[in-house]
Amino acid sequence: MEGLRRLETQEQSIREILSTLSIPVGVSIGEARPLSREGWESVVSLPFRFVNMYAHQMPLFVHQDGRIDKFVSIGPGYMLEQVKTIAEMEQVVALEAAIVSSQAKLYPFGLLDLSTITLISRLTPKPVFLRTQKRVTPDDMPLILKTGVRGITLDPSILEPGIEEYRDGVRGFVQWGARPDNESR
């Protein structure tokens, strides 16, 4: 509930920021505490276009609520049959592959990770996004996008700490996406 209380105290700022953006913006609800119906109503009262939650943490009242799109995060240990079933659900508009166990988060993105996101991307025609829980660089993107992944969610844990370092890390991916020779987009 603490995170949702912070959301409520920042409501005016959130509304102002979202009113200036032309891209869809969502909110990621973490695992601090189970989400209550009251907390959910606070979320949907804000102008977010989608909510992102792990499947094992998403209450059915969230899943069934048609007021907001659902991006469902797939964690390590989910069986492929579960992933396919979740992807087939009408209320789910996209999957986020958050497939890295906490022990492996400091390592570079590797071949096993690449093969796993390839499998997940092949299971569904819906968009699949990769949460960058391991070190991924802009140079890795052409190969990652060839798997069928439609984009990435930059996890701050892979970037250097500090505001300037974070900006530089994000800037590297933005510049990669804007390159005229980038045919992988």
Model-based region annotation:
Residues 1-6, 87-118:
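Glycine/Thr-rich beta-alpha phosphate-binding loop at enzyme active sites
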Residues 2-45, 55-64:
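N-terminal active-site wall of soluble small-molecule enzyme domains
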Residues 1, 23-31, 50-53, 68-74, ...:
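Hydrophobic faces of well-ordered beta-strands that scaffold small-molecule active sites
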Residues 109-110, 158-185:
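C-terminal helical cap(s) of enzyme catalytic domains, especially alpha/beta-barrels
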Residues 34-45, 78-89, 134-150:
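Catalytic cores of alpha/beta
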Residues 97-107, 117-140, 145-156:
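Catalytic-face loop-and-helix region of soluble metabolic enzyme cores
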